[in-house]
From Swiss-Prot:
Name of the featured protein: Guanine nucleotide-binding protein subunit beta
Gene3D superfamilies assigned: YVTN repeat-like/Quinoprotein amine dehydrogenase
UniProt subunit comment: G proteins are composed of 3 units, alpha, beta and gamma. Interacts with gpgA, and this requires phlp1.
Native organism: Dictyostelium discoideum
Family as reported in the entry's similarity comment: Belongs to the WD repeat G protein beta family.
Physiological role: Guanine nucleotide-binding proteins (G proteins) are involved as a modulator or transducer in various transmembrane signaling systems. The beta and gamma chains are required for the GTPase activity, for replacement of GDP by GTP, and for G protein-effector interaction. Required for normal chemotaxis in response to cAMP and for aggregation during scorocarp development.
InterPro entries: G-protein_beta_WD-40_rep, Gprotein_B, Guanine_nucleotide-bd_bsu, WD40/YVTN_repeat-like_dom_sf, WD40_repeat_CS, WD40_repeat_dom_sf, WD40_rpt
Keywords recorded for this protein, A-Z: Cell membrane, Chemotaxis, Cytoplasm, Membrane, Repeat, Sensory transduction, Transducer, WD repeat
GO molecular function: enzyme activator activity; G-protein alpha-subunit binding; G-protein gamma-subunit binding; protein kinase regulator activity; signaling receptor complex adaptor activity
Record bears the keyword Chaperone: no
Subcellular location: Cytoplasm; Cell membrane
Assigned GO CC terms: cytoplasm; cytosol; heterotrimeric G-protein complex; phagocytic vesicle; plasma membrane; vesicle
Sequence ranges of the WD repeats: 60-90, 102-132, 148-177, 189-219, 231-261, 275-305, 317-347
Disulfide bonds: none
Lineage of origin: Eukaryota, Amoebozoa, Evosea, Eumycetozoa, Dictyostelia
């Protein structure tokens, strides 16, 4: 009896592999060109050396910065550090607007809500903590704790003031009702820690990147995985939607960033260099999508030409790993955060 079942399982695996091979073959037939070939005659970007400079240094954290996120007003940003503080900054004046003490200093992620009413954070406490910035209490206290993950919280992103998506080391993502503190949908299909999420511009989908070296596209309405993207050879640490919502970028421990197209269901470009041997911690796109910004373990932030796959600039200035970065929605600046306890705003 058991041998029959075992044989059926083996046959099912063979059938699945055969179908996958068929899908790959059909996809290759449709792939009549590559992005590199298509953009070969496109004029290169002008020299960027000295054009992008540090315009603001945000000093205030006393330990490694692990995460930052811009508000949609393009002025304020939130940062999370292992000094046990969540700081809300005015990026223009460099003033600290709020200093929120955390219950757990082992924080790994933070997020600003679209209305700028709330910020969220989480980490090794397995909890997503929500703070109301409109609260009259000082210091601001946690107003909601979302507690269902069985592993560390690696990333969180608001859809609106009432809903937030979290990813975790328990290999799942969860969509939460912030008001009630309850779980709406659990997304489970990864075979490794989920490290990063990025929500689509229309708020109907999100991308996740994980330690199983895959990125997955999820439908927030059905709760199902719609597409799986492979190609990386190590953990995916960062994912970010392309501005038009039809593609997304990834950064991995295999020392490469990649661009995947959702409609073509395939990888479009790799961003690598012989001199780059370290992992990528974070990725972001310029307003137009022509630049891909990537933070690296070697203390640098590299700027890539998205269409041609060439490195156009390397931003140096941090004294330790660049752990996070972000571009505001108006695309007017780039903020990098580092283990050197500093945030830098470039423009």
């Amino acid at each position: 009896m058991s041998s029959d079942i075992s044989e059926k399982i083996q046959q099912a695996r063979r059938d699945a592999e055969s179908m996958k091979e068929q899908i790959r073959a059909n996809r290759d037939v449709m792939n009549d060109t590559t992005l590199k070939t298509f953009t070969r005659d496109l004029p290169g970007l002008p020299k960027m050396e000295g054009k992008i400079k540090v315009r603001r240094n945000l000093k205030g954290h006393l330990a490694k910065i692990y995460a930052m996120h811009w508000a949609e007003d393009n002025v304020h940003l939130v940062s999370a550090s292992q000094d046990g503080k969540l700081l809300v900054w005015d990026g223009l004046t460099t003033n600290k607007v709020h200093a929120i003490p955390l219950r757990s200093s082992w924080v790994m992620t933070c997020a600003y809500s679209p209305t700028a009413n709330f910020v969220a954070c989480g980490g090794l406490d397995n909890i997503c903590s929500i703070y109301n910035l409109r609260s009259r209490e000082q210091p601001i206290r946690v107003c909601r704790e979302l507690n269902s993950h069985t592993g560390y919280l690696s990333c969180c992103r608001f859809l609106n003031d009432r809903q937030i998506v979290t990813s975790s080391g328990d290999m799942t993502c969860i969509l939460w009702d912030v008001e009630n503190g309850t779980k709406i949908t659990e997304f489970s299909d990864h075979n490794g820690d989920v490290m990063s999420v990025s929500v689509s511009p229309d708020k109907n989908y999100f991308i996740s990147g994980a330690c199983d070296a895959t990125a997955k596209l999820w439908d927030l309405r059905s709760g199902k995985c719609v597409q799986t993207f492979t190609g990386h050879e190590a953990d995916i640490n960062a994912v970010q939607y392309f501005p038009n919502g039809l593609s997304f970028g990834t950064g991995s421990d295999d020392a490469s960033c990649r661009l995947f197209d959702i409609r073509a269901d395939r990888e479009l470009m790799q961003y690598t260099h012989d001199n780059i041997l370290c992992g990528i911690t974070s990725v972001g796109f310029s307003f137009s999508g022509r630049f891909l910004f990537a933070g690296y373990d070697d203390f640098t932030c590299n700027v890539w030409d998205t269409l041609k796959g060439e490195r156009v600039l390397s931003l140096t200035g941090h004294g330790n790993r660049v752990s996070c970065l972000g571009v505001p929605t108006d695309g007017m600046a780039l903020c990098t955060g580092s283990w050197d306890s500093l945030l830098k705003i470039w423009a």
